[in-house]
Curated annotation (Swiss-Prot):
Gene Ontology biological process: adaptive immune response; innate immune response
PANTHER family: T CELL RECEPTOR GAMMA VARIABLE 9 (PTHR19256:SF44), T-CELL RECEPTOR GAMMA CHAIN (PTHR19256)
Protein name: T cell receptor delta variable 2
Lineage: Eukaryota, Metazoa, Chordata, Craniata, Vertebrata
Top-level taxon: Eukaryota
Gene: TRDV2
Cell compartment(s), UniProt: Cell membrane
Length: 115
């Protein structure tokens, strides 16, 4: 029997970016099965996503915030092999794929933008 984990996908807005911009998660909670690829999406409202750098972070139960990905294929230590970030300019959307989720990937995921 496969264990089901739950990844919570929330948006985070960084200071220094105009207040008219909003990052909106596609879903607040994304159910994920161990080993089955999962996709998190975050859209930008109020501005073109191509004008900003998009970053993804994970917060674990211990409240540790860890950098996962920044646009232009920059990954945090240990994330490059199992995570894939992308920007869909046409849809004004940031995408983070977890290629083979495991129990250690459980947590709250945040998308953020900066210039």
């Amino acid at each position: 029997m496969q264990r089901i984990s739950s990844l919570i996908h929330l948006s985070l807005f960084w200071a220094g970016v105009m207040s008219a911009i909003e990052l909106v998660p596609e879903h607040q909670t994304v159910p994920v099965s161990i080993g089955v690829p999962a996709t998190l999406r975050c859209s930008m409202k109020g501005e073109a996503i191509g004008n900003y750098y998009i970053n993804w972070y994970r917060k674990t139960q211990g409240n540790t915030m860890t950098f996962i990905y920044r646009e232009k294929d920059i990954y945090g230590p240990g994330f490059k092999d199992n995570f894939q970030g992308d920007i869909d300019i046409a849809k004004n959307l940031a995408v983070l794929k977890i290629l083979a989720p495991s129990e250690r990937d459980e947590g709250s995921y945040y998308c953020a933008c900066d210039t």
